[in-house]
Amino acid sequence: MGSIRLMHAKLHRVCVTEANVNYVGSITIDPVMLERVGLLPLEEVDIINLSNGNRFSTYVLPGQAHSKEICPNGGAALLCQPGDRLIIFAYELCDRREVLQKGHQAKVLVTNESNETVDFYLQELIPKEDGVKFINNICSEAIPH
């Protein structure tokens, strides 16, 4: 059956706090946010800038914990400015047959303009006889109050 790329982690509507054109590539992100969705340092991410429509790929660097930092660096800094809202997501390569048998789970963290968590979702593919069922579960217990 082959392989399929499935989204496994997403930071939704995060707000750019800084843009540093003088840093060599990447996007710096608060490591607490990275951990919540399972993104690793140096992992490739796709980014959509909701404020201007730019779409680009880069890799992740961890910033300072609890800083709520979202800082595109290098060339990516030319595509964003502080205050822009971004969607940052990563894929993983999965065996299609295994997904149909065991399912798949993606974590989605939604933030407000201060990069505080407002929603946290587990998006799941659940195996069933004729394929998979998509479920979008909000996890209110995972949201800091």
Curated annotation (Swiss-Prot):
Q: Where is the protein found, in the record's own terms?
A: Cytoplasm
Q: Which residues bind substrate?
A: T58, G74, G75, A76
Q: Which GO terms describe its molecular function?
A: aspartate 1-decarboxylase activity
Cellular component GO terms held in the UniProt record: cytosol
Q: What class of enzyme is it?
A: lyase
After translation, the protein is modified as follows: Is synthesized initially as an inactive proenzyme, which is activated by self-cleavage at a specific serine bond to produce a beta-subunit with a hydroxyl group at its C-terminus and an alpha-subunit with a pyruvoyl group at its N-terminus.
* Catalytic reactions of this protein: L-aspartate + H(+) = beta-alanine + CO2
* EC number(s) reported in the record: 4.1.1.11
What are its GO biological-process terms? alanine biosynthetic process; pantothenate biosynthetic process
Q: Which Cys residues form disulphide pairs? A: none
Family indicated by similarity: Belongs to the PanD family.
List the PANTHER family. Answer: ASPARTATE 1-DECARBOXYLASE
Q: What is this protein's function per UniProt? A: Catalyzes the pyruvoyl-dependent decarboxylation of aspartate to produce beta-alanine.
Protein name from the UniProt record: Aspartate 1-decarboxylase
What is the organism lineage in this UniProt record? Bacteria, Bacillati, Cyanobacteriota, Cyanophyceae, Synechococcales
Name the gene.
Answer: panD
